[in-house]
């Protein structure tokens, strides 16, 4: 199993716990900015890539939800969207797969790309069932400049959280 598959499986296990990963990062840090973007640019179609449990999405967004670690949302999206949202996701992906995932995000976007990345180790430690080995939830921890080099474009909004 390569590191991408390992972290995907760790995320699947973690998402099964109803007490973890509620998507509060989106709710607490990004909804207002995203709503302003939607209104200002008359955005009609939205993809949340890495939506997690999708507990805090405003219903008026009518977003397409995708998360390969959540069975309910694991069907890959089709087409392009006016806005692609990807918050608190990329730091959970091994470095050797970042460029591929960013390319996917850009392919799904026919308009705006809103990305938020955390640049520090996570408080969460992930484990596989029946294993003592613990993995930090943030596998790719890089400075902001590193992320800026990989995620850039005319209609890209890149935010950082601590």
Name each model feature, range by range.
Residues 111-114:
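Short glycine-centered segments of the SAM/dcSAM-binding site in methyltransferase folds
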Residues 1-81, 99-102, 108, 119, ...:
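Conserved N-terminal segment of class I S-adenosyl-L-methionine
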Residues 89-92:
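Hydrophobic adenine-recognition pocket in adenosine-nucleotide-binding enzymes
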Residues 85:
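A conserved beta-strand element that flanks and buttresses the S-adenosyl-L-methionine
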């Amino acid at each position: 199993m390569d590191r991408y598959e390992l972290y995907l499986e760790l995320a699947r296990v973690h998402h099964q716990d109803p007490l973890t990963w509620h998507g509060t990062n989106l709710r607490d840090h990004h909804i207002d900015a995203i709503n302003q973007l939607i209104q200002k640019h008359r955005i009609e179609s939205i993809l949340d890539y890495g939506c997690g449990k999708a507990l805090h999405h405003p219903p008026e967004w009518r977003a397409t939800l995708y998360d390969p670690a959540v069975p309910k949302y694991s069907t890959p999206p089709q087409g392009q969207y006016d806005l692609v949202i990807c918050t608190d996701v990329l730091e959970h992906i091994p470095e050797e797969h970042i460029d591929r995932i960013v390319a996917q995000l850009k392919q799904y976007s026919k308009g705006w790309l809103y990305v938020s990345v955390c640049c520090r180790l996570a408080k969460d430690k992930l484990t596989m069932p029946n294993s003592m080995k613990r993995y930090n939830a943030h596998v790719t921890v890089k400075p902001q400049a590193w992320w800026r080099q990989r995620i850039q474009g005319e209609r890209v909004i890149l935010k950082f959280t601590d």
